[in-house]
């Protein structure tokens, strides 16, 4: 059996999977009918996998969101986008590979698609800078969004980044300014914008393409102002407290839905999107088409106003005298 990437919390499934593989080998090498036994074990494994993934902690969801085989932006584009043409460059001398974009069709609709892109292995991750976009990447995204605005193409963005690249060169090139300009200009767009957190949505790197009329996220994706490791290091000077920070940050779909940050949490197959990527693609396509149907019926002033009000209404204010802080002691 080919070895697969395994989480610590998946270890209880290993023995079952080994038994299933042994029975499959027996069926291949003999004429013994083991279909009933195989069905029982596969059903049991599926049920246990579902139970495990329904009970994930925020820290465990982060692991799933970072799975190396989780479908990426280009994976989803290949699943449900026709006539995809990638567009390159920010017209200022940069073509950041950590952020990709282009035009294509979903059904009969022409759309612009932009998203962070990670790699599958070390070599590709280095080329893609681990999905951490530079100022050139965000300026490329803005150039493409201006193109979509000019030609009235709906914009779809896919968020999957630990954060914007924080290297010295990125700061010298104006990382903060590039993201800030994107935030400002995305509020002014005259076309529908749908953003989806497909993996991890970290800090300003996620926000740089995240101002949208609809913000969706997958069930085991995370969306956070800072990584739990960074938060723990800042608050407690101890990165080992990352699990506590993950719980306090409210980074999961249900928490963000209740806070009004996201509009819909998309279900994932038991085991996560890496377990059944085509199924995940079908779920995402259906959601995108459904929300586009709603948004394309709005006038420009309605789009802009609802986008503005959506962000103004996010979150809630806690009473300073209240003990409800969300932070562990």
UniProtKB/Swiss-Prot annotation:
Entry's EC annotation: 2.1.3.15
Family label: Belongs to the AccA family.
Signal peptide as annotated in the record: none
Xref: NCBIfam families: accA, AccA_sub, PRK05724.1
Keyword Ion transport among UniProt keywords: no
Lineage: Bacteria, Bacillati, Cyanobacteriota, Cyanophyceae, Synechococcales
Primary gene name: accA
Main enzyme class: transferase
Superkingdom per UniProt: Bacteria
Described function: Component of the acetyl coenzyme A carboxylase (ACC) complex. First, biotin carboxylase catalyzes the carboxylation of biotin on its carrier protein (BCCP) and then the CO(2) group is transferred by the carboxyltransferase to acetyl-CoA to form malonyl-CoA.
Annotated organism of origin: Prochlorococcus marinus (strain MIT 9303)
Name listed for the protein in its UniProt record: Acetyl-coenzyme A carboxylase carboxyl transferase subunit alpha
């Amino acid at each position: 059996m080919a070895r697969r990437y395994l989480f610590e919390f998946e270890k209880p499934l290993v023995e079952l999977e080994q038994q299933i593989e042994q029975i499959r080998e027996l069926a291949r090498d003999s004429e013994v009918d083991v279909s009933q036994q195989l069905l029982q074990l596969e059903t049991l494994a599926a049920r246990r996998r579902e139970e495990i993934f329904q009970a994930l902690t925020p820290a465990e969801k982060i692991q799933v969101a970072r799975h190396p085989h989780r479908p990426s932006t280009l994976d989803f584009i290949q699943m449900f986008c026709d006539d995809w043409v990638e567009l390159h460059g920010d017209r200022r001398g940069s073509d950041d590979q950590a952020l990709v974009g282009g035009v294509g069709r979903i059904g009969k609709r022409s759309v612009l698609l932009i998203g962070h892109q990670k790699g599958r292995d070390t070599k590709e991750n280095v080329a893609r800078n681990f999905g951490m976009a530079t100022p050139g990447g965000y300026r490329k995204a803005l150039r493409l969004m201006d193109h979509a605005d000019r030609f009235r193409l709906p914009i779809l963005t896919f968020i999957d980044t630990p954060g914007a690249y924080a290297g010295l060169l990125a700061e010298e090139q104006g990382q903060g300014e590039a993201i800030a300009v994107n935030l400002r200009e995305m509020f002014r767009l005259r076309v529908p914008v749908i953003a989806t957190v497909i993996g991890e949505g970290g800090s300003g790197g996620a926000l740089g393409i995240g101002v949208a009329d609809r913000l969706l996220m997958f069930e085991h994706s995370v969306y956070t102002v800072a990584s739990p490791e960074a938060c723990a290091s800042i608050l407690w000077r101890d990165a080992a407290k990352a699990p506590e920070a993950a719980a306090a940050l409210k980074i999961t779909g249900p928490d963000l839905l209740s806070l009004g940050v996201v509009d819909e949490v998309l279900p994932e197959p038991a085991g996560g999107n890496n377990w059944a990527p085509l199924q995940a693609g079908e779920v995402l396509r259906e959601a995108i088409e459904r929300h586009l149907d709603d948004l394309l019926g709005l006038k420009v002033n309605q789009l802009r106003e609802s986008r503005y009000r959506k962000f103004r209404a996010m979150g809630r204010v806690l009473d300073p005298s209240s003990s409800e802080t969300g932070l562990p002691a």
